[in-house]
């Protein structure tokens, strides 16, 4: 399935494809 956003941002970056940092949590683009 598609990766799920929601990890904590690390130095302003998200490592899950299609996610962006909405500090402090990654959100779907």
UniProtKB/Swiss-Prot annotation:
This is Cyclotide mela-7. Probably participates in a plant defense mechanism (Potential). Binds to and induces leakage in phospholipd membranes, particularly ones containing 1-palmitoyl-2-oleophosphatidylethanolamine (POPE). In vitro, displays cytotoxicity against cultured cells but no hemolytic activity towards fresh erythrocytes. Not active against Gram-negative bacterium E.coli ATCC 25922 or Gram-positive bacterium S.aureus ATCC 25923 up to a concentration of 64 uM. It comes from Melicytus latifolius. One of its GO terms (biological process) is defense response. The presence of a 'disulfide through disulfide knot' structurally defines this protein as a knottin. Belongs to the cyclotide family. Moebuis subfamily. This is a cyclic peptide. The lineage of its organism: Eukaryota, Viridiplantae, Streptophyta, Embryophyta, Tracheophyta. Keywords: Cytolysis, Disulfide bond, Knottin, Plant defense.
